[in-house]
Swiss-Prot record:
Classification via SUPFAM superfamilies: L21p-like
GN (gene name): rplU
Alphabetic keyword roster: Ribonucleoprotein, Ribosomal protein, RNA-binding, rRNA-binding
Species per Swiss-Prot/TrEMBL record: Helicobacter pylori (strain J99 / ATCC 700824) (Campylobacter pylori J99)
Subunit structure comment from the entry: Part of the 50S ribosomal subunit. Contacts protein L20.
Protein name: Large ribosomal subunit protein bL21
Family in the record: Belongs to the bacterial ribosomal protein bL21 family.
Function: This protein binds to 23S rRNA in the presence of protein L20.
GO terms for cellular component: cytoplasm; ribonucleoprotein complex; ribosome
GO biological process: translation
InterPro entries found in the cross-reference section: bL21-like, bL21-like_sf, Ribosomal_bL21, Ribosomal_bL21_CS
GO molecular function: rRNA binding; structural constituent of ribosome
The organism's taxonomic lineage, starting at the top: Bacteria, Pseudomonadati, Campylobacterota, Epsilonproteobacteria, Campylobacterales
Length: 104
């Protein structure tokens, strides 16, 4: 089974062909094709090739499924005996992609 590790938006993802991954928002239309070129490592047929920092000639092709926002995450801070509190919400914008091909 071949897999790849790539970097996008300051995070690293391990994927195989056919995986569905949530990436940071990319402002792409559904069905658009995306190339991810910051590939850190590729494993094909049990042979691992690591890059310094990226693997030369390696790329990952993906198809955009949709864009959306995650569920709201609430952060709440309360300072005891001070009658002071803070409530803040956060929703992450994401692009859902399907990995179609790993080229190494």
């Amino acid at each position: 089974m071949s897999y790849a590790i790539f970097k996008h938006g300051g995070k690293q993802y391990k994927v195989v062909e056919g995986d569905i991954v949530l990436l940071d928002k990319m402002n792409k239309e559904p069905k658009a094709l995306v190339e991810l070129v910051e590939v850190l490592a590729v494993s094909k047929e049990g042979k691992l090739s690591c890059g310094k920092p990226f693997v030369n000639g390696a790329k990952i092709e993906a198809e955009v499924i949709n864009e959306g926002r995650s569920k709201k995450v609430i952060t709440f801070k309360k300072r005891r005996r001070k009658d002071s509190k803070t409530k803040r919400g956060f929703r992450r914008d994401f692009t859902r992609v399907r990995i179609t091909k790993i080229v190494a």
